[in-house]
């Protein structure tokens, strides 16, 4: 509401942040983002204001500037401690100052400080970033502007110097006291087929008849009430490309920016495996913290996070291959396991797991994922069954880097597939644990269904890994390439691979070209992709490729302000400052040095409220303040624990010819647990070997009578097994 004192929070405190304006420029698969925060001090006293906000983990923030009453002030990137010292000195000397920094514990949380904002003053703070856009399974490029920064659980660790520890106020999305606007321009030489969004956008306006450029914008009056998602479909996305960008040798004679840089984008034509992997140890780590009781999104009738996760877990359990091993862990402030150790996948163990799934609730307190991860990694490996870890979480944790480091330390013995559930899930955590352990990450929000994404990940886990990946260059004499990207260890069919390199030496004449090769092996076969490209670098005032290359390097080396190894901290700091890309070790600082006179009067603090999802406030005490004992519980007595190499004791193995037991899931129970999703209901009745019992439950879900089903089954099948329908549906192929 607008009152004479300005926009107010529920505490009747004026809010100096008036609006957020975002300009988005997408060229091919790279997004350039310019976000402007408009402040105005409508009070009679000078202000110091704080604003904590989310950004995507992949964003390379390279510019920060302030326009104060028409005067532009460009910030400098400094070592973080030095930047803080400059800011505190400026404030104490009554100078206007502006500070932008990445949180010390997570690279997807930022804090903006505005110090000594004079009464009546207006300031526009603009930060610029670039990022690669991920490719969805259906060929869409996905851009997300994070809006929601939900409270992060702090656990028992010490996070007093986190941005989130400033205790900035939170408000429901509908009560946000500032407005939001966004304008986007998209261009591609291959042509734009369509643009979709989860938010109300203006009709797409194509610029030119060839549809290589288009513009869209959020409709007027949009409330920043959800993450803004754009899906961009080009006519062709699987063409490999190489882009070469000019360096800046005059201004950086010895730095990272001196030489030209190259960005190589491969789309390897990886063939389908001749025989999928049927072995493996599949461990599902399910978030059961209080925040999982929140809805996935702000939308009406949005599914609760825990219910969506349970529904997805059922599909995954139904899709495992007979003979593999599996287990399910739930975690919060404490954790629980379905079985004392991973058990062999049979009809009986599957049904036991499904009974446990139905009982799962978001009742385990805070989001403490580190301990169950360590427990899982301590378990001895099962010979011939490599570990595949599936993590489902809303990511509301503070110690992001500690968790990523734990996964990274165990990367050689497993692959990790991660799923961020709901608005506000930490992109730093979800992307980070998948990246360091050779898996993939997915985000599920709004109407977006989790099942198809989870099943795609399972299908990838069942494929043999691409091995012996290498990138090599064929360049003219006198020119060499220095790789900047971390070594890629795993590739999956349909995935894109982006690598960066610096080109040093003498650049050849205009007509010269180079080649780059991607080589790998799959099931003993040697495969190769190659791209020929022009060696004439193109100028870019924003040095987009250099900064994306720097971000790729920083992602691999920067493990947080406190946790980055000493041997890497020096390189992180140098690369960050050379390229102007923010890191955990640096911060942007700007001081209004030409202010005519010091700011007068006592300084008053104002914290800009940040949005939370509807429903989060009701469970916040449950998962922010909970301190349950850290104890592992099991539903089995020690005497019944199987060894790691034996079958689950007391339960017959289907491969020995035993028929599966009659399923204990009825049609009515399916409808109660899984609503009107008939596909999920159908899969819930499926046996471990892929068959169904021909009974009234199956007939009811299919909308047929039992007599109709029996009539449709071939006579030979009925003669062999009158109670089962042996036609298997591969759930891994559903909706992919």
Indicate where each model-derived feature is located:
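Proline/serine/threonine-rich low-complexity linkers at boundaries of modular beta-sandwich domains
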Residues: 10-15, 461-469, 473-476
């Amino acid at each position: 509401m607008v009152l004479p004192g300005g926009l107010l929070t529920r505490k009747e405190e004026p809010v100096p942040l008036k609006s957020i304006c975002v300009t988005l420029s997408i060229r091919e698969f790279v997004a350039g983002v310019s976000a402007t925060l408009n402040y105005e001090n409508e009070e009679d006293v000078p202000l110091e204001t704080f604003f904590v906000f989310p950004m995507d983990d992949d964003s390379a923030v390279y510019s920060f500037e302030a326009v104060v009453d028409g005067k532009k002030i460009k910030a400098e990137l400094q070592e973080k401690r030095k930047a803080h010292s400059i800011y505190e000195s400026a404030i104490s000397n009554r100078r206007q100052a502006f500070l932008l920094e990445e949180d010390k514990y997570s690279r997807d949380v930022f804090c903006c400080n505005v110090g000594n904002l004079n009464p009546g003053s207006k300031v526009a703070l603009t930060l610029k970033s670039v990022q690669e856009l991920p490719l969805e399974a259906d060929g869409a490029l996905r851009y997300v502007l994070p809006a929601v920064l939900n409270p992060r659980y702090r656990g028992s660790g010490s996070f007093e110097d986190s941005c989130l520890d400033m205790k900035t106020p939170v408000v429901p999305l509908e009560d946000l006291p500032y407005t939001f606007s966004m304008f986007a321009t998209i261009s591609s030489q291959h042509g734009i087929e369509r643009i979709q969004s989860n938010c109300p956008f203006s009709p797409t306006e194509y610029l030119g008849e060839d549809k290589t450029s288009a513009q869209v914008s959020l409709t007027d009056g949009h409330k920043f009430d959800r993450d803004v998602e754009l899906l961009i479909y080009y006519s062709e996305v699987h063409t490999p490309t190489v882009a070469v960008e000019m360096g800046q040798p005059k201004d950086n004679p010895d730095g990272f920016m001196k030489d030209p840089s190259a960005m190589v984008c491969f789309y390897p034509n990886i063939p389908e495996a001749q025989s999928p992997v049927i072995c493996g140890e599949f461990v599902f780590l399910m978030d059961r913290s209080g925040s999982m009781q929140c809805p996935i999104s702000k939308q009406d009738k949005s599914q609760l996070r825990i219910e969506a996760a349970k529904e997805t877990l059922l599909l995954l359990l139904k899709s495992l291959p007979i003979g593999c091993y599996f287990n399910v862990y739930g975690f919060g402030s404490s954790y629980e396991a379905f079985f004392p150790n991973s058990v062999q996948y049979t009809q009986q163990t599957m049904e036991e797991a499904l009974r446990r799934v139905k009982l799962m609730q978001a009742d385990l307190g805070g989001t403490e994922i580190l301990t169950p991860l360590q427990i899982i990694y301590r378990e001895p490996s099962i010979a011939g069954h490599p570990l595949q870890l599936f993590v489902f979480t809303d990511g509301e944790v503070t110690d992001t880097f500690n968790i990523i480091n734990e996964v990274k330390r165990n990367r050689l013995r497993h692959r990790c597939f991660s799923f961020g559930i709901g608005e506000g899930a930490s992109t730093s955590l979800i992307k980070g644990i998948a990246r360091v352990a050779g898996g993939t990450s997915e985000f599920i929000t709004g109407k977006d269904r989790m099942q198809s994404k989870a099943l795609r990940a399972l299908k990838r886990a069942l494929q043999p890994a691409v091995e012996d990946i290498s990138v090599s260059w064929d360049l003219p004499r006198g020119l060499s390439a220095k790789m900047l990207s971390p070594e890629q260890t795993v590739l999956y069919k349909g995935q894109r691979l982006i690598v960066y390199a610096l080109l040093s030496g003498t650049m050849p004449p205009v007509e010269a070209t180079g080649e780059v090769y991607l080589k790998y092996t799959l099931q003993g076969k040697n495969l190769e992709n190659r791209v020929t490209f022009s060696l004439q670098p193109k100028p870019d005032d924003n040095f987009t490729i250099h900064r994306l290359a720097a971000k790729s390097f920083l992602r691999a080396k920067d493990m947080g302000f406190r946790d980055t190894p000493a041997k890497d901290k020096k390189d992180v700091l140098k690369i960050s400052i050379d390229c102007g890309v923010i890191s955990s070790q640096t911060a942007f600082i700007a001081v209004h040095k030409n202010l005519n006179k010091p700011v007068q009067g006592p300084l008053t603090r104002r914290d800009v409220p940040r949005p939370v999802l509807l429903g989060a406030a009701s469970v916040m005490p449950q998962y922010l303040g909970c301190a349950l004992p850290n104890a592992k519980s099991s539903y089995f007595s020690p005497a019944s624990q199987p060894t790691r190499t034996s079958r689950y004791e007391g339960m017959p193995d289907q491969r020995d010819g035993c028929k599966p037991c009659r399923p204990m899931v009825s049609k009515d129970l399916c409808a109660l647990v899984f609503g009107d999703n008939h596909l999920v209901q159908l899969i819930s009745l499926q046996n471990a070997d892929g068959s169904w019992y021909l009974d009234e439950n199956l007939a009811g879900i299919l909308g047929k009578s039992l007599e109709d089903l029996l009539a449709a089954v071939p006579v030979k099948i009925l003669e062999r097994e009158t109670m089962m329908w042996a036609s298997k549906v591969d759930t891994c192929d559903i909706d992919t």
